[in-house]
Amino acid sequence: MSISSCSAQDGCASTAMTRTAMRQNKFATSAPASVPRLTGTEPQLGSMQGAQELLEQLKASFTSSHLIQAIGLSGRQLPLLTKDQEILPYLFNAAGVRYVQPHPNGDASQRILLLNVPASSPTPDVVLSAILKHRLELIHEFELSLGYEHLSSDQILEALLPTSIVDTDGVPTGFTIVGHIAHLNLLSVYKPFRFLVGHIILSKHIGTLRTVVNKLDSIDTQFRFFEMELLAGEADFVAQVSESDCSFQFDFRSVYWNSRLHAEHMRLIKKCRPNQVLADVMAGVGPFAVPAAKRGTWVLANDLNPSSYESLTKNAEINKVLLREGEAKPDKDGGLVATCMDGREFVRWSMLEVWKRGFAGRPMGFDGEQFDVQDDKLRQSARKMRKEQAKKNRALYAVRQAENTLEGAAESLANLSVDEPDVAATMGQVERHPERKLVDHFVMNLPAIALEFLDAFRGAYTHLATIVGKQRLLCQLELHKLDASIHRLPMIHVHCFSKDPFTPALDILTRANEALNIPRDAPYRLMAKPILPPAQTFAGLRKLCDASQSASYLSSHPNYSKYKHLESQHDFMQYVHQEWLERDAAQHTPNLSIHYVRDVAPNKQMYCLSFQCPSQVLWANTSTSQHT
């Protein structure tokens, strides 16, 4: 293992260096050149236990000794140097090594300060001056032993893997953390070393990780979760995760969870206002549904996967938002009803279920134009009401506990009645807007197929009207005039993928209109101004002259010849805006947005299409609809 050091002659010292700068200026350590490289054919690599034993054998080869200079001093004298801005740059600064060490003479009152100066180098003048000034001891040679524990996962793998792999593909240390589980997605080139990689990662995150898994290529075709292989640690796949002020628990083997979508979850959660109704068609374990319910939204959440449904129900219960069938009306706003059925069936079912339940309407007095401000005030008011109600309940409980003695009961009743604060009105006494009988938001978060499920909305109100009565439904639709938080038409938020590198918005809207069975020339079709294509599109267009592989998917696109000459972002957007003008007369459907979520692959992006479902779709004649 080598240590790169600096001295005053190197110009590394800075009289103004702070502790923060010192921490950021860690000195690089590397594995000794003597560490044996693996070939991938070692028998121990074929099993989890074998890889663990091999790693234990290899750890000793990472050990190396270094002779550096140090300063001997008493414990009381430490602040004289550790707070000296001129000395700080010369203190030894490497990961996992304290620059304050016990003195080798064994005196418990003595310490040494390790210096970032090799024994063979001259002692910096500023250090010598400090030693003379404070009458300290200069130790010309101190042997420092560094090893496996002082290196990162990257450095260890760089030393162990074949140079042909390291130079071409780097090292596989990137992973996602889900609770106590590290989730890797290893390339095939690392397959012979997968168990070793798992044990190295586990050894570097002791106390945080207990399980390391690798995602396999196979995917469950019905429920869309990946098979995985245990690489290291415990076979414990039940993860506990905190997100959006909620706690989640689930078996990672049988459900889908992506911690990288946290920001997207919160973005949509914030679109749901208190007392609105949200129907989550593909809810999974509840990353949208549970936090939304906790923030005061009425939620109906569904997932076809029985394991997801089980976790969804449990997570709603853990976070105290579960509404069970047959239970009394909740004593607070917001709650979650969980179901397990097909997504298309759920769309129709949820509309009827909301109508039957008639969720509590929004309390009056929070109807200002600044929705965010009013919603925050409403949530604060609800929290205050719950706290005061809880205080009253505790006082009443104390009375009941004291009923064993007349004297104790009388005293408790007296304490309860004297200077008792006014208790907020109960749920039934709060003046409210009418009951919520319609869904305000639908969320469909299964990007591989969610767009296909939009056909479930065709004729949905026509179907509902045959059950509840058309006139009653029409009257309910007019309530938005009294309560601005009511959507006259439901907002649909559908996640999807697009592989169109040039016009992703047009690609998404074309598929959405087809699923909704909206004719291409219909005035109510979904339309939107073009959005910026992925950044790699422009980079690829510039590289195409070299026939680079990164741009091959561009040149194979059917519209490549139309856009290949547009290398700059400005020229490209001008061109597609002109196409939009000719195609849609530059019309953009009101309340429609297409939000970029993340890159899934160089030629595959995830988006969220949000739009208000056209009334022509909801009231379509189902007898002539393509919906099945």
Swiss-Prot record:
Keywords on this record? Cytoplasm, Methyltransferase, Mitochondrion, Nucleus, S-adenosyl-L-methionine, Transferase, tRNA processing
**What catalytic reaction does the record list?**
guanosine(37) in tRNA + S-adenosyl-L-methionine = N(1)-methylguanosine(37) in tRNA + S-adenosyl-L-homocysteine + H(+)
Give the protein family: Belongs to the class I-like SAM-binding methyltransferase superfamily. TRM5/TYW2 family.
Where, by residue number, does S-adenosyl-L-methionine bind? 265, 303-304, 342-343, 445
| Gene this chain is encoded by | TRM5
- Put simply, this protein is called tRNA (guanine(37)-N(1))-methyltransferase
Q: What this chain does, per the record?
A: Specifically methylates the N1 position of guanosine-37 in various cytoplasmic and mitochondrial tRNAs. Methylation is not dependent on the nature of the nucleoside 5' of the target nucleoside. This is the first step in the biosynthesis of wybutosine (yW), a modified base adjacent to the anticodon of tRNAs and required for accurate decoding.
Q: What is the lineage of its organism?
A: Eukaryota, Fungi, Dikarya, Basidiomycota, Ustilaginomycotina
Q: Where in the cell is it found?
A: Mitochondrion matrix; Nucleus; Cytoplasm
Q: Which organism is it from?
A: Mycosarcoma maydis
Oligomeric state and interaction partners are given as: Monomer.
User: Which HAMAP family does the entry mention?
Assistant: TRM5
